[in-house]
Amino acid sequence: MALLSAASTAAMAQDGGSSRFSAEFEIEIANDYTFDSDDPAAELNDTYVTIGAGLSFALAESTSINAGLVFEPILDPADDRFFEDHGLYVEELFLSHDFGGAEVVLGKFNPAFGAAWDLAPGIYGADFAEDYQITEKIGVGINIPITAHGGEHTLSFAMFNADRSLLSNSLGRERGQTNLAAGGVSNTNSPESYSVTVSGNFGATGYNFGVQHQEGGQGDVADQTGVVLGLTHSFDTGSVPWEVLAEVAWFDKFDGTRNSARY
């Protein structure tokens, strides 16, 4: 249950009012309480804060350096806890350049795949859809805007591998630096994994469709492949507009195991 959330934006201007630096912050205080479970050890009360910061600095008119910072619990709760085990880490740090017909992203970023992890409320986003969100990858991405059939669309392609740099660790409660021996899909020597997605809207209806292939790492029995399809539709009912959302995702050899998964 989320208790409090807030978001704010800020910009620093120079050279007669032109803004080169911008920042966006989001703060959420939440409480997760499991009051009954087949496993008594899972009956926990966990209160925590999640703070996200998006920073951008324009090097030129079409070129910028972008960073995403996250402060949140690093460890899963083993007992009741109250604002414990928090750490700060760099989720994204990349250079982007807009060529007009396409944007190129280079560095550490979150490749596009699905949208429910961002759009769905409560546990449907944070606890379910975030299981298949692709985050903290090193590589290159291309985003191509398309205007067609009365709608705005984006075709995205990314090649990547897991981040094993110092940025994979955290400050405060440390999560440790990732290494090849840790295994896990996309944890390879080079960008051998990829995702391809298309998203957009037709009026009040939005959609996203994506495929991914993540190469197995050390100790994994197979490569992971996945497909996602999502739809949204907004209804203007006057003073209280509302939106419906549906997204399904299917994976073969999920997390490099022999198991499939559906969300």
Question: How would you name each of these model-derived features?
Answer:
Residues 15-36:
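Transmembrane beta-strand segments of Gram-negative outer membrane beta-barrel proteins
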Residues 1-20, 60, 123, 148-151:
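Cleavable N-terminal export/targeting peptides
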Residues 17-20, 152-156, 189-263:
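Detector for outer-membrane/organellar transmembrane beta-barrel domains
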Residues 35-38, 122-126, 176-183:
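Extracytoplasmic loops and strand-loop junctions of Gram-negative outer membrane beta-barrel proteins
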Residues 29-37, 69-75, 99-101, 108-112, ...:
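Transmembrane beta-strands of outer-membrane beta-barrel pores
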Residues 45-165:
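Outer membrane beta-barrel
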Residues 50-52, 91-94, 103, 139-141, ...:
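Membrane-embedded beta-strand positions in outer-membrane beta-barrel channels/transporters
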